[in-house]
């Protein structure tokens, strides 16, 4: 049987290849530190050769991506004033090529293939961690936690969060049945187990918040587009007031206490303070992309020692915005935040304006997860990370024009509601039709 090369780059027609490529990409993102450069080359080999099949279709119009590449280009430019220019050059090029791969995936992968690939990839990553993982002692809070095959429980927790979210999206948004419904259920249970064993409060709280938000948006989008915005605004105002009331009532300390944390977030607030002080050294353009946490630099060495980081690597300020302003200054912070905010609110706008759009529903949840985690992690700031891959995938989808469909009923009279991602074909008789 001959398979057309064009089917490799046609969304929906390349499902098998797309699932394989996404699953292997996630494995590389998770464990490239273990398997080295060979795994990175395999990642490039999955996406870059697709350009040779049909470069116009795969690359699209890069003029529409200028706002997406703005931070990436600026990160590369920081080599001219970087405290570690060779490191900034290497990591800047890596980040740029990583963004290109994410945009190629965006052009060639549809939302159902993305969801299935993420489920498969998360399951493989978590199974590997269960088979070859270890426990880690945290000297700051005096506890042991399962970190899997990662260096941090928060990374294990992030992949578990993705497994839970995409399993939820597969069943409740895309309406998967049969084999993939079972796969989503199994992957979701595996991810939930890993999330609990990791004891990552960040991942547990953000996962619960995003799932709750998506359920709320699922209810809002059951209305016609004209009514959604008013209900969303009302719900947002109510949620904001409730959040403020909870903070003043001590609800935050109560929640943190349930996870064995205090108001310092296990030293995060001290790290944030140190990051803000470091940003004052070069507030406009920063010290250079990836040029702060460098062995031999006094401030980095001091913080590694204070937080018992014996490897003297893989550490950060646990806040995307602070990390960005330290490395790339206010200019870089604005450019990166522009991509993150546009990805989140752009998908939200589509969700509130269009009829039953499963792609926007799934990507809105992805944007929400990355946006919330940005305040406590740096998932989108480094190359070969699943967070940055998903960010640019989500942002890139906004550059593809949408075909406006005629307004339809939510579901025909006398029939059960369809899953969120399913639509009714034209053969369904209209009410009163005699055929």
Curated annotation (Swiss-Prot):
Its main location: membrane. It is a multi-pass membrane protein. It comes from Rhizobium meliloti (strain 1021) (Ensifer meliloti). It holds the Pfam family Wzy_C. Involved in the production of exopolysaccharide. Keywords: Cell membrane, Exopolysaccharide synthesis, Membrane, Plasmid, Transmembrane, Transmembrane helix. It comes from the Bacteria. The chain crosses the membrane at residues 11-31, 35-55, 65-85, 117-137, 156-176, 178-198, 203-223, 230-250, 325-345, 361-381. GO terms for biological process: polysaccharide biosynthetic process. Pathway: Glycan metabolism; exopolysaccharide biosynthesis. GO terms for cellular component: plasma membrane. It is found in: Cell membrane. This is Exopolysaccharide production protein ExoQ.
């Amino acid at each position: 049987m001959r398979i057309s090369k064009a089917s490799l780059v046609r969304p929906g027609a390349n499902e098998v290849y797309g699932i394989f490529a996404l699953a292997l990409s996630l494995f590389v993102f998770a464990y490239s530190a273990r398997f080295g450069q060979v795994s990175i080359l395999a990642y490039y080999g999955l996406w870059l050769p697709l350009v040779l099949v049909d470069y116009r279709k795969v690359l699209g119009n890069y003029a529409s991506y200028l706002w997406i590449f703005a931070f990436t280009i600026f990160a590369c430019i920081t080599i001219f004033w970087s405290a570690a220019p060779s490191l900034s050059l290497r990591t800047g090029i890596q980040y740029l090529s990583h963004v290109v791969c994410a945009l190629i995936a965006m052009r060639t992968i549809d939302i159902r293939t993305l969801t299935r690939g993420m489920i498969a990839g998360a399951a493989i990553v978590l199974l590997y961690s269960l088979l070859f993982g270890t426990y880690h002692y945290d000297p700051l809070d005096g506890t042991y936690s399962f970190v899997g095959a990662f260096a941090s429980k928060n990374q294990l927790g992030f992949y578990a969060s993705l497994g839970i979210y995409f399993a939820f999206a597969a069943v409740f948004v895309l309406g998967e049945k049969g084999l993939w419904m079972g796969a989503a259920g199994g992957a979701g249970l595996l991810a939930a187990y890993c999330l609990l064993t990791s004891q990552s409060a960040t991942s547990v709280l953000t996962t619960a918040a995003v799932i709750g938000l998506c359920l709320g948006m699922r209810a809002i989008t059951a209305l016609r587009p004209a009514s959604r915005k008013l209900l969303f605004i009302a719900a947002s105002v109510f949620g904001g007031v409730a959040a403020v009331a909870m903070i003043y009532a001590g609800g935050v300390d109560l929640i943190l206490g349930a996870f064995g944390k205090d108001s310092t977030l296990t030293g995060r607030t001290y790290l944030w303070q140190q990051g803000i002080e470091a940003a004052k050294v070069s507030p406009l353009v920063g010290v250079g992309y990836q040029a702060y946490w460098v062995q031999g630099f006094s401030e980095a060495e001091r913080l590694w020692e204070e937080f018992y980081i014996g490897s003297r690597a893989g550490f950060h300020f646990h806040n995307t915005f602070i990390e960005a302003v330290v490395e790339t200054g206010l200019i870089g912070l604005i450019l990166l935040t522009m991509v993150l905010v546009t990805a989140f609110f752009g998908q939200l706008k589509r969700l509130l304006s269009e009829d039953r759009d499963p792609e926007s529903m799934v990507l809105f949840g992805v944007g929400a997860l990355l946006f919330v985690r940005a305040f406590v992690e740096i998932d989108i700031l480094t190359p070969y990370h699943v967070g940055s891959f998903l960010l640019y995938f989500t942002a890139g989808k906004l550059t593809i024009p949408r075909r406006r469909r005629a307004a339809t009923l939510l579901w025909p009279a006398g029939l059960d509601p369809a899953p969120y991602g399913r639509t009714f074909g034209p053969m369904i008789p209209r009410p009163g039709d005699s055929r």
